[in-house]
Amino acid sequence: MLEIKNLTGGYVHVPVLKDVSFSVESGQLVGLIGLNGAGKSTTINEIIGLLTPYSGEIKIDGLTLREDATSYRKKIGYIPETPSLYEELTLREHIETVAMAYGIEQSIAFERVEPLLKMFRLDQKLDWFPVHFSKGMKQKVMIICAFVVDPSLFIVDEPFLGLDPLAISDLIQLLEVEKKKGKSILMSTHVLDSAEKMCDSFVILHKGQVRTKGNLQQLREAFGMPDASLNDIYLALTREEEL
């Protein structure tokens, strides 16, 4: 479970988030939605520990980064928007490196990812280097590496970029399975049609603050738009930005 309470933070001398509070329950997929510059990436960077909050608290399963940084980080499986691979390491070596970093036995790591390697059709490419991978293949490697960890919280940032329709379908299926296992999932995306179908709840960020949160019906009530889709609500945010 992810709990964020009264989070204010951002970059040095540049506050971005202002008193942000929301939670992601176990077995829940929450969509983090907002215009560009709303604070989505900053929120993610605060959660994974790349930024230090000015004030407020972030807990995963009741644990803060300050209390035990190693245990806290082991609870997170992060799939970034932009794939970041080591050009000198093969796919196999990437998996081995992640396992080593998290203190996971190599045999267990490969047992965990074997179904994903087959699903993403990378099982015959374990000795390939990133230079031979397309952007979509690199994104699949990032997904596989996140699943090595077997975390309690998945943070998925714009997961559909670069993926073909089959891989998108596979990823949606994977996240659904993890939900059923009781994992918490926070997903930032602009693919609103998919988010509307996948997510149990939403957090709408606007200008660094939580504009509203809840399921689609609760968002409709907050915006006074009884029949709105998630895309309609996003467009309403755009109009608010222009005021």
Functional labels for PLM-detected ranges:
Residues 56-67, 71-72:
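Conserved ABC transporter NBD signature motif
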Residues 96, 100, 107-125:
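Conserved ABC ATPase "signature" region
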Residues 129-136:
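Conserved ABC ATPase signature
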Residues 154-158:
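Catalytic Walker B motif of ABC-type/P-loop ATPase nucleotide-binding domains
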Residues 213-214:
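ABC ATPase "signature
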